[in-house]
């Protein structure tokens, strides 16, 4: 008897960001028997689980059983001992599930206090450990660079993490697509690698200073692949860092950033899985599939093809500005799945002055934008918020713009018995059919004068300038 392990080649590349959204996904591997007299096959697919970046529900498997790899990883294993595909025939193992993916943007300014690590915690012990040649904190280059960056940071965890992120982006290149994870010595010698290998450099530098860090391994709904890194802050949680995105966009900020377009298939690297009961194999990266086959003839080949496709089932709509008034407008949106609140910042476009910052609860679907000046252009930055542990994250940022309307005036002829307000010769004229109270307001919001008007016509001279006249529910803009 012979058995042969083959793993899928990994294509890790970047692509444009998609909106936070939900998918119905089918993940499968098809084995085609080219010329074997097969006696047995064992096939493994990673099983995605819910975590801070995604919610996974409704898992269904074509065959096999789901097993726990560790606290944060699972896999589907099917051991096929009869009914093997004959030469030229195929066998497919598949899983289907629904997933909602969450973009994550973290404002580092919220971390005003950093706590020492609990060195006895499971997170600390697992994610500061070496892993053979793949995470090797004794590597001379890793030791030298980590010591230098640690000194530059003054021993501050966040400063050190950012320096590591910038160091990798500045000193290494994206190379060798489809190679999977290499030993750290190879990555350093080559001067880079694909996104998983670039993440490896960051993870090695973090673990060298006993800061918990790990790879995040994904497959996108279109079947492409990506890997980024996370590091951990005690009492706060995990922070995403996408070094490869920084290489693609050198002016972008991908520190505390997750695009939200990849289905996380596993976390960390170097996993030990049982391909048969009681028999274990350590694979470097669990992203697509592993498989083994046994055959009677002297030689033989079984080819494998992986396919993951997601059908989008829901996408959050873009926020919409309602009808604008001279003094404001309204903003509305469909609820964002997973959001724990919403924030809008309103600023004056011409000056950049922040006018207002409004926070709304998770069940809100609209907010008023009041107290704005007439005939003025404003920008609105709308952000759905999501609390992840003790970290406030934003699930994307939406930039909108509006221009407020002009204050209605009444300088035209109006039939007798109707309210009329007009300016002539530097004077204010008000004709009202009944007693009214009028407010003369300057454009900066200051009440210049309050008038108690009898029925009939009223007039007074006005200082030069522009004013808003409020009478009942009517408002008028006049220039003197």
PLM region spans:
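Intrinsically disordered, low-complexity N-terminal segments that are enriched in acidic
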Residues: 20-104
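Conserved aromatic anchor
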Residues: 327-339
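C-terminal outer-membrane/trafficking sorting elements
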Residues: 343-358, 373-383, 412-480
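Active-site rim recognition segments
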Residues: 223-313
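Secondary-structure boundary elements
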Residues: 91, 97-190, 201, 283-289
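Active-site neighborhood of thiol-dependent amide/isopeptide-bond enzymes
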Residues: 152-235, 249-252, 257-263
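Residue-level detector of functionally pivotal "anchor" positions at catalytic/ligand-binding pockets or at interdomain
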Residues: 311-324, 399-427
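Short, flexible loop/turn segments at beta-strand junctions in immunoglobulin-like
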Residues: 83-85, 335, 369-373, 459-462
